[in-house]
């Protein structure tokens, strides 16, 4: 099976595990973009501990779920966004102000839309979570 979008696969695995009420999920295959996205989710309290397991086939992450995710998903296609346009994308993907985050890949790394607005930087939209 050819995996075209590893990040989308990881987010859907998290969503399915949350719906089923699981306490942890194993994400495989992985890449650096997936790891940095998980770190943003961890920083905002949507997931717990992230553990990397090297299985000799590219590795996998075991992510502890906290039951705080109502919806999570990739943003496809990955739209480029300027920092002045972030509010418009918030209104499109998030249910209300101050609820949820957009994950953005910027020149300064993968950050949330809140951090991108504070730093006044744009980037590419990767995912949403609330």
Swiss-Prot record:
Domain of life: Archaea
Assigned keywords, A-Z: Ribonucleoprotein, Ribosomal protein, RNA-binding, rRNA-binding
Pfam families: Ribosomal_S8 (PF00410)
Family annotation (PROSITE patterns): RIBOSOMAL_S8
Keyword Coiled coil among UniProt keywords: no
GO molecular function: rRNA binding; structural constituent of ribosome
GO annotation, biological process: translation
GO cellular component: ribonucleoprotein complex; ribosome
Keyword Calcium: no
PANTHER family: 40S RIBOSOMAL PROTEIN S15A
Family: Belongs to the universal ribosomal protein uS8 family.
Record's subunit section: Part of the 30S ribosomal subunit.
Task performed by this protein: One of the primary rRNA binding proteins, it binds directly to 16S rRNA central domain where it helps coordinate assembly of the platform of the 30S subunit.
Name under which the protein is recorded: Small ribosomal subunit protein uS8
Organism: Pyrobaculum arsenaticum (strain DSM 13514 / JCM 11321 / PZ6)
């Amino acid at each position: 099976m050819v995996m075209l979008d590893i990040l989308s696969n990881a987010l859907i695995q998290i969503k399915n595990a949350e719906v089923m009420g699981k306490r942890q999920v194993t994400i495989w295959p992985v890449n650096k973009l997936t790891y940095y996205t998980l770190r943003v989710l961890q920083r905002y309290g949507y997931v717990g501990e992230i553990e990397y397991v090297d299985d000799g086939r590219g590795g996998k992450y075991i992510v502890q779920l906290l039951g705080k995710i109502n919806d999570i998903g990739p943003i496809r296609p990955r739209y480029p966004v300027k920092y002045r346009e972030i509010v418009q994308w918030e209104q499109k993907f998030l249910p209300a102000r101050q609820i949820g985050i957009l994950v953005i890949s910027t020149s300064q790394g993968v950050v949330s839309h809140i951090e991108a607005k504070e730093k006044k930087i744009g980037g590419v939209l990767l995912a949403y979570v609330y």
